[in-house]
Regions:
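Transmembrane alpha-helical insertion/packing segments
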Residues: 1-48
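Juxtamembrane "helix-exit" motif on the non-cytosolic side of transmembrane helices
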Residues: 18-29, 51-54, 77-87
Length: 164
């Protein structure tokens, strides 16, 4: 039962993304939310990594399952915005593909803009870079939480063994 709860946890970044985009339109609150959301999402994703580490799922599978939606979102984005033309693009799939990493925009935009020739210009290149960087950031954060818990657990086991 506990492992089934993990499925719900990996869908929550979509909710973060939706709320970030929704609240961004509210004066005052939107700017604050937009600024804080990357840190909230990264702390949450670190915690999700910890939860997957505690699960009964084998380590490799836990790392894959925990990050599968993040990677699939990036692939969906690539398909919708790079491979398909504007006339064939699904607005629903196009928006969903960005929700997973959109809360990280205040961080990833700083790197994506570096790829532009003109200052303060955002093109498809910088947006794709933002999505790739966001995905990498989430995978690393998840992995950090996962490893943190494994190390903590192994130290506790060592203390218990030494204490007996």
């Amino acid at each position: 039962m506990r492992d089934k709860r993990l499925i719900i946890l990996i869908f929550i970044p979509f909710v973060f993304g939706y709320l970030t985009n929704l609240v961004f339109l509210v004066p005052g609150v939107g700017t604050l939310t937009y600024s804080l959301m990357p840190f909230v999402l990264l702390i949450y994703w670190f915690w999700v990594g910890i939860q997957f580490s505690k699960s009964s799922i084998k380590n490799v599978y836990a790392l894959i399952y925990g990050n599968i939606l993040c990677v699939l979102s990036l692939l969906l984005y690539y398909w919708q915005f790079i491979l398909l033309g504007d006339e064939k693009r699904s607005m629903f799939l196009a928006s969903i593909s960005q929700m997973y990493v959109s809360p990280l925009s205040p961080i990833t935009a700083r790197f994506g803009i570096m790829l532009e020739k003109l200052p303060n210009v955002i093109t498809q290149t910088s947006i794709l870079a933002m999505n790739i960087i966001g995905t990498i950031l989430l995978v690393i954060t998840f992995f950090a939480g996962f490893i943190f818990e494994k190390i903590k657990h192994s130290r506790l086991e060592k203390v218990e063994i030494d204490g007996k």
